[in-house]
Amino acid sequence: MSIFRTIALFVYLFGYMIVHYSVLCKAERALAAGDTETVRQLVKKHIPHWSKGVLNVTGVRLSVEGLDNIPKDGPCVFVANHRSYYDIPLLLAGLNEPYGILAKEELGKIPLLNRWMKLLGCVFVQRDDVRASVRALNDATAIVESGRSFIIFPEGTRYKGEEGGTGEFKAGAFRIAVKTSAPVVPVAISGARGLFEAHGNRATPGTVYVRVLPPIQTAGMSRAEQKQLPDAVRQTILAEL
């Protein structure tokens, strides 16, 4: 059964984008014309719908808690643990609206998907190139400075260890929040690896829990507090896994 779900996943994944290709082109024309409101409306309508479809097709049940912890008076930086390829559609479906993501450069090479991600405000990072990584962080910082919230996975890659753990949270991504004085909103994702990777990269039904935790203010942080921030956020997330 899992093989059929996996096939259905990829058929839906790209089928939706092909069927809605005219919407993509409309959004790109609006962006080129400087009509950011039309872009925002189209992205807000279609990205969550696409993401929820990915979950529905593969029998994923999503439980979300803590949406009231998302700041309403300005942008924030969501910091989530990274366990699965599913993490991106889980957050795009589960948060109050879709946000840009600091994503690996490989996603920027996938036809159609890369164009939607650019409209969403995603930034692609080349992890093995220091200068390119700095440019990506600067681009993400500019997005938050413009008033839009942003999502980062500070581990830099999927954590493949035991359930309930995370990799090291790298400090670089936290500079986005510190430079913009935006609050950090920790997000704990549990159960995601069991949807795909734990079963030999085959789509498997299951329940995932996304917990949005209280924001951590970065404005006025001392150097010592900034240095401790990555591990403090990691420990906050670990306590919820």
Segments from the language model and where they lie:
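Thr-Gly-centered strand-to-loop micro-motif
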Residues: 65, 102-104, 126-127, 154, ...
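A short, well-structured juxtamembrane/interface segment
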Residues: 49, 53-75
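Active-site phosphate/pyrophosphate- and oxyanion-stabilizing loops and adjacent acidic/basic residues
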Residues: 52, 89, 174-175
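Catalytic core of membrane glycerolipid acyltransferases/transacylases, capturing the structured
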Residues: 20-33, 40-44, 55-57, 72-130
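A hydrophobic membrane-anchoring feature enriched in long, contiguous, low-charge segments
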Residues: 3-29
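Non-catalytic C-terminal accessory region of glycerolipid acyltransferases
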Residues: 3-4, 134-241
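Structural motif marking the loop-to-transmembrane transition
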Residues: 3-11, 39-43, 177
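Generic preference for hydrophobic
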Residues: 64, 78, 101, 152, ...
